[in-house]
Amino acid sequence: MAKTPMRVAVTGAAGQICYSLLFRIANGDMLGKDQPVILQLLEIPNEKAQKALQGVMMEIDDCAFPLLAGMTAHADPMTAFKDADVALLVGARPRGPGMERKDLLEANAQIFTVQGKAIDAVASRNIKVLVVGNPANTNAYIAMKSAPSLPAKNFTAMLRLDHNRALSQIAAKTGKPVSSIEKLFVWGNHSPTMYADYRYAQIDGASVKDMINDDAWNRDTFLPTVGKRGAAIIDARGVSSAASAANAAIDHIHDWVLGTAGKWTTMGIPSDGSYGIPEGVIFGFPVTTENGEYKIVQGLSIDAFSQERINVTLNELLEEQNGVQHLLG
């Protein structure tokens, strides 16, 4: 019996990240190889963006994906999010030359307020929302606060890129395959302040911390490399990391919908007060997922260094959150 198609709304659909993302969604990489999808693609209502979106859709058509059950272009969030089961909020205002962080937060607050309200009004009540557009945690917070009729837990931010970056650095350091690393995760904000934590990580049952056994490497090499990886890629390629961000978005939704089979991963989610993170702050936590629900991994001890790092990333998030509070009505 063929499954009912799932409606996937994607914003910023003519942008760089989506050029890597949409083809993989249509190919079944995100929701499974037996799950048909309908793509509902939102772009800003200017002629150039809408024309570019038509071009992307022509290419998607030309792939003749068996799982693609439909595809529509939109300039209005109210139609783009109609009955959506999954929403990937990729489009965001990038930081322009001479733009203060405060200006960036305000510009994005407008976008994510409008989108949050539209999701609240027309999307499926079980919608799963992932915010990719930066500042992702705070944009997710704005969307969540703009959708009061939906459960807060439906709104998440992408920490999976930091998580995957951390995995690849640990694999390189230990000489072990990425697939053998378990119980690694990331705390906090998707920003250079994030704290990738391998104190509990294991490779084939052995402790990664004991294998590496180098606090200076953790502090001076590993954490800065993961935290500043985005900047390093811009420096090398001249453009921001789009394909790896798209891949992380696929991973995040895949694991949320299809489950992690007991394995730990990282999601930016509204805090329930765990680990002293104030309730409602969108924060990176170690989670497991099952039957479309995520659960924070509990009972981990936090040493002094970890607490210090968690406090830094939390304070940054609280500052961002306070900076947009007046825009949330």
UniProtKB/Swiss-Prot annotation:
GO terms for molecular function: L-malate dehydrogenase (NAD+) activity. InterPro entries: L-lactate/malate_DH (IPR001557), Lactate/malate_DH_C (IPR022383), Lactate/malate_DH_N (IPR001236), Lactate_DH/Glyco_Ohase_4_C (IPR015955), Malate_DH_type2 (IPR010945), NAD(P)-bd_dom_sf (IPR036291). Keywords: NAD, Oxidoreductase, Tricarboxylic acid cycle. It is an enzyme of class 1 (oxidoreductase). SUPFAM superfamilies: LDH C-terminal domain-like, NAD(P)-binding Rossmann-fold domains. GO terms for biological process: malate metabolic process; tricarboxylic acid cycle. It catalyses: (S)-malate + NAD(+) = oxaloacetate + NADH + H(+). CDD domains: MDH_chloroplast-like (cd01338). The active site is at residue 190. It holds the Pfam family Ldh_1_C. HAMAP family: Malate_dehydrog_2 (MF_01517). Belongs to the LDH/MDH superfamily. MDH type 2 family. Homodimer. This is Malate dehydrogenase. It comes from Aquaspirillum arcticum. The lineage of its organism: Bacteria, Pseudomonadati, Pseudomonadota, Betaproteobacteria, Neisseriales.
